Each structure stands twice: as structure tokens, then as C-alpha cells.
């Protein structure tokens, strides 16, 4: 019987490549992002490419095309000075990595799954979030995904 999962205990991390085009595999290489409150879907539907020929009489035919994550994805965080400092450190580390041809890897750890989700991305500097009366201050920080998200073995301790 399947064990169904919840979002309780999900963590999100980042690490800059030590070796170009090689995902970091040691847990110590990753830094946790604090205050993550929402992670966008990374399960896009592929485009449909129509392959209907003239001899079809009732239905069109298709093959799957490319998937599109939509470019920049918004991750929701509870705003704090710790988050602001951590996000600035992330953006700075990413800029330094890109200057040397390296990438920043993001890792989402869901308790109960044997693999983690990994992708490379470019974070956007944080702006001022929307604010309202008597509410939690949240910010949606953007990361532009730069490769195909993959499920892979979680980093070793």
C-alpha cells in the first residue's frame, strides 16, 4: 500500500558548482534557503505537435513536443532579514559562478521520497513585496530555470 506524502518538512537548498557542469553531491555543499512557503509546479504539459494527414477522417493526431516551465518561476517566502541576507548571498554567489562558467544548482528535498529534485537556475535580485494591512509579509522571489529538472539521489551527508 502506498504511503502518501505531505508538504510537511520540505526543504530547499542551493549550491554553486565546484566543477563546471557537475551537480554537487555532498550535502555540505548546499545552503538551505530560509522561510520557503511555496514552490511552483515543475510538471509542465508538453506542447502538442499536430501530425494529422489528409487521410484522417475523424480525429486529428499528435505527438508530444517540448515542455515549457515558463522561464522565471516564483518561489514564495516569509520575509525576514535572514531571508534578505541569504537571498543577496545567493544572487552574489550565482553571479560569481556565472562569471567563471559555472551554474547554481537548486535542490528540493521532500521527506518520504528517496530522490530529490535538482535544477540549475539564475536567481533574480529581491525587490519590495506587496504589503497589506494586518498580514504576513511574504515575498515571491524569482529563479529562471536553466536546465531540465531531474530527480536524482539526494546529497550524501
Explain the meaning of each model-derived region:
Residues 2-79, 120-136:
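Solvent-exposed edge beta-strands and adjacent loop segments
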Residues 1-4, 144, 148-157:
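Viral virion structural and adsorption modules
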Residues 107-151:
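Short beta-strand and beta-hairpin "edge-sheet" elements
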Residues 31-34, 92-99, 125-128, 140-144:
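Short, low-complexity, polar/charged sequence segments that are solvent-exposed and flexible
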Residues 54-120, 150-157:
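Extracellular/virion structural assembly segments
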Residues 16, 23-24, 86-90, 143:
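Extended hydrophobic/Leu-rich segments
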Amino acid at each position: 500500500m502506498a504511503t502518501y506524502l505531505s508538504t510537511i518538512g520540505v526543504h530547499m537548498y542551493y549550491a554553486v558548482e565546484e566543477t563546471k557542469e557537475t551537480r554537487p553531491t555532498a550535502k555540505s555543499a548546499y545552503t538551505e534557503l530560509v522561510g520557503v512557503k511555496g514552490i511552483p509546479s515543475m510538471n509542465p504539459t508538453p506542447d502538442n505537435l499536430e501530425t494529422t494527414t489528409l487521410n484522417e477522417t475523424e480525429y486529428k493526431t499528435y505527438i508530444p513536443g517540448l515542455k515549457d516551465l515558463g522561464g522565471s518561476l516564483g518561489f514564495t517566502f516569509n520575509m525576514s532579514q535572514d531571508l534578505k541576507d541569504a537571498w543577496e548571498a545567493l544572487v552574489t554567489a550565482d553571479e560569481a559562478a556565472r562569471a567563471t562558467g559555472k551554474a547554481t544548482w537548486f535542490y528540493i528535498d521532500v521527506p518520504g521520497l528517496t530522490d530529490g529534485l535538482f535544477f540549475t537556475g539564475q536567481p533574480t535580485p529581491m525587490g519590495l513585496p506587496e504589503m497589506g494591512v494586518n498580514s504576513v509579509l511574504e515575498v515571491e522571489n524569482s529563479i529562471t530555470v536553466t536546465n531540465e529538472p531531474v530527480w536524482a539521489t539526494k546529497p550524501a551527508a
